[in-house]
Amino acid sequence: TEGDLIDTDQEVDPDLEVVGLQKHLDGSCPILFENVKGKPGHRVITNLFGDINVINKMFGWQDDTDRTKKLAYALSHPLAPEVIDSKDAPVHQHIIEKPGDVNEYMVPVRHTEYEPELTVGSGIRCVTGEHFDGGSDLGYNRMNFRWGNIGTFQISPGSHMWQVVSRYYKSDEPVPITVCFGVPPSCTMMAGAGFDYVILPEGCDEIGVAGAMQGAPVR
């Protein structure tokens, strides 16, 4: 009712159209696509952080100054996440083991006609505990499931994930990683907060900061 969301039930193709519309509306409000071609039961939201005024409303910040103060406080006062037992976790109510093609259960998109494949850009990659020096790391990584249920993702040089890879590259020990979808907006924001390692060094608690940002522990 305040004009902060475009909600459409017009069919949109994840091949070029979703990202094309998003790009056309850069800097504006979020867009919720209710009718995704070839993906019944799926919805897609883009431009979630395209408008700083919408972001302020999303988190209850009065203005830009209030946002700066609240974010600074959250960075130095993380809230430990609340761990939910698997039997009680909503995300474990429906489990698909060994899927033949992971892309069937997500909405990968194609950005340009020059790309040979669809890309998953909405997954939030998570590494925690001893593999991140006792902390928690969230990040965006362009992902592709090229071989059914085997995926690859791009790691930016110097990023937190790059630090993890550098540490374990020659190790035979697998590094546990989860890729999460539909996470709270605070986690999505923290996933894009890397590369400033004076503020967020290796071993920091990004999930904890996300909890402080939203005013309650991430569950």
Predicted regions and their residues:
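Extended, highly charged
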Residues: T1-R219
